[in-house]
Amino acid sequence: MSFNLLDLPIVPRQKALKYLEPIDLFELSLCSKRMAQSVRDLKIEASAHFITLTRGQSSVHVQFKERSRAIWWDFKEIFMKKDLKDKRKIGYILFENCEKFRRGAFTLDEFYCHFDNLEEGAAAVSKHFQFLFPGPLNILLSPTVYRHLEFLFFEPSIQKCESFEMCGADIPAKRTMNRIFDKLTIEKKLCIRPKTSENYVIKQALRVEELFLRSARWMTREHLLELNCIVADLSDHNFQCSDFEAFAEKWMNNKSSKVENLRFQWQSDVEFKLENLKTSRWDSTRRERNYIFTMKNESVQIDCSDGFELERNDGRLATFVVEQQEDRTHILYFLVWIELFPEKKRLENLPKTLGPLYKQLEKINRDYPDESSLERLLSNPNLVYTEFLETYKVLKNMDGENRSPSTGQAFRRTIFDKIYNTIDL
């Protein structure tokens, strides 16, 4: 006996739908606009939407906050067109050659599809995903590979994204850049990996939270003074020492500045000097030696002991730090000290951070009571951190002689590694 799911009252209908995986909800949503709205009414949020159009990949996918299985729609021609026999209509587009695959081991659900206009197809699929499962959009694009960007950015749901990354080796034409930046609003992160024309100004680059430019020669002093990114990494620019002084002076007079971590890289034989800016040397009573931040999920430390210190009238400190490489490459950091003693704070929080790991060790030692004396020592949450680091190095050296660790030893090593990496920045 069959029945129409939409004939159910709204509460039991929503309860029934919530038992389904996102890919099944997506399939149901293609039945009618009413069913699509019913799926949207479940309020299943996406952690992120992605559009990837590069030389090696052309896909749309969505990841979820509370669901483990992502949905992928892949336009890459992995299978023969004649073997993709399903049809699906999304919006006004009929995809005549597609096929669904479910991969339990990889916790993802995937559609493979042949479609000639990839930009138009990606826009249609992403628009529907975003309607069903609201969440931020991230775009990765090789603009010199895909020639019909007007079909992608014509769609309003694609005209605003959380992050935009441009990749590729060729310099994009001005017309191509206009097709992107005349339509697209970027809310948080902009990364442009290829070189770009010195004559093309990307105004919204100055206002995103995170900015990464391989080529910043289009930026003038006026653009530098407008820069209000939390994090920026600019290579190959035309700035002089006097421009950096002007930037620092503006920061000194601007308490609302969002700037925290700026990195400038260029090649020159000119020594970095601050001629007119009043600076001081490092005072260990006012801040720590190292500036600590996270990059690509890894902790990074910059030694600021030889930096040029600035103090704003509200007490906020900033430091210019210069690193010079052997190949004439200069790296200049402008670092704002939001936390004056980050390592001290990190060490104070370590017991709380490491607590769950030591709890896991307790359970492992109960289930596998074959720990050695060194392993028992390392399992002690009250062990001094420096002693843990030294003891674990000794244990790792001894492991070379034991090529067949027991199950308990293998489990303990995994936790010890995590503790070691957490303690030792």
Swiss-Prot record:
Coiled coil: none annotated. PANTHER family: F-BOX-CONTAINING HYPOTHETICAL PROTEIN C.ELEGANS (PTHR21503), PROTEIN CBG06869 (PTHR21503:SF49). InterPro entries: F-box-assoc_dom_typ2 (IPR012885), F-box_dom (IPR001810). PROSITE patterns: FBOX. Residues 2-53 form the F-box domain. This is Uncharacterized protein F59B2.9. It comes from Caenorhabditis elegans.
